[in-house]
Amino acid sequence: MQISEPVLFKGAPGSPYTRKMLAYLRFRHIRYELLIGDQTQHKNLPEPKVQLLPTFFLPDDDNKIQAVVDSTPLIRRFEADFEQRRSIPQDPVMAFLNYLIEDYADERLTKAMFHYRWYYQADIDMAGTILPRWTSIQSPEAELQQ
């Protein structure tokens, strides 16, 4: 089923995969609506089989909205559905290198990101202050401190 714009998805500001997909959508000039934290509560959206971010809400073959996760297959789907500014090279060798670098970045470079997010005390304190706000942006300060 062809995807219509704006593409609706749920993510978190500090999620590396949300950042990846935001960069991809912006590069491709694909209009989107990003839902953060509890903004999805009243939208009657399906739940993904696995709770991962970002979660895209896209039509299936029967035009029913499905919750879809995993950035690499999502990019392949968007490449097929949107014509403007393709990100995957046409040359097969370059396309393979593109996939290889993307896979390495997805699976390995996030380890460094999580290390620096949680290793040093100043970073632990900062993350502990910011992370609860990503999923509950409407919660009062006292509740977030618990």
Language-model segment annotations:
Residues 1-142:
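GST-like domain detector, emphasizing the conserved glutathione-binding G-site
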